[in-house]
Regions:
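N-terminal Rossmann-like NAD(P) cofactor-binding subdomain of oxidoreductases
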Residues: 1-133
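Charged docking surfaces used in two-component/phosphorelay signaling
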Residues: 110-184
Length: 185
């Protein structure tokens, strides 16, 4: 079963899965593995806590083998994908220090439907703007995945809306460890 529903809706569907059903979810419903963190960032109570343990944060380039053993496959968000894919290998190999600065820019389609209502009186189509500061929803998802590798990673993440419909660019500022060459990274 594939779902691309508003946050909270796939949780309801997951409560009715049959034994052989697999749910592939594009919402944030199962991205966060902690019900309290989910509520903090998404402002709604998780309605399928029992299924969190049956789900996996499925970034296939990183955890391909583990995906096949789960009933609920949660697809990462766009910003987290653009940030985690380049950083996880560097963190796993301990090539970089733990302070990471990410400056991300996205087309306005990535901010969801509500963005058009929120900015209807602004010139969304001709200017750039920061949003979701200081606590963008994807911070929780990114930090969760970092914590699986190393604790105490300091992430400074600033998302921007750009005057284009779709696309994403994340510029990531890292400091390599002293004994590491640029080629190693």
């Amino acid at each position: 079963i594939f779902t691309a529903l508003p946050n909270g809706e796939s949780q309801i569907i997951s409560n009715h899965l049959k034994e052989k059903n697999i749910l592939i979810d594009l919402s944030a419903d199962f991205r966060i593995q902690n019900k309290h963190t989910y509520k903090e960032f998404y402002k709604i109570k998780h309605r399928s806590v029992k299924n969190i343990k049956n789900s996996i944060y499925a970034l296939p380039e990183i955890i391909k083998k583990k995906i096949k053993n789960k009933k609920i496959i949660s697809c990462p968000g766009c910003y987290p994908t653009s940030i985690l894919l380049p950083l996880i290998p560097l963190l796993k190999k301990r090539l970089i220090n733990k302070k990471i600065i990410v400056d991300s820019k996205s087309g306005y389609s990535g901010a969801g439907r509500s963005i058009h209502k929120k900015y209807k009186n602004h010139n969304l189509y001709e200017s750039m703007s920061v949003y979701g500061i200081p606590k963008h929803r994807h911070n929780s998802e990114i930090q969760q995945e970092f914590n699986k590798i190393s604790k105490n990673i300091l992430l400074e993440f600033t998302p921007h809306l750009t005057p284009m419909f779709r696309g994403i660019l994340s510029t990531i500022y890292i400091e390599k460890k002293k004994n590491v060459s640029t080629k190693d990274c």
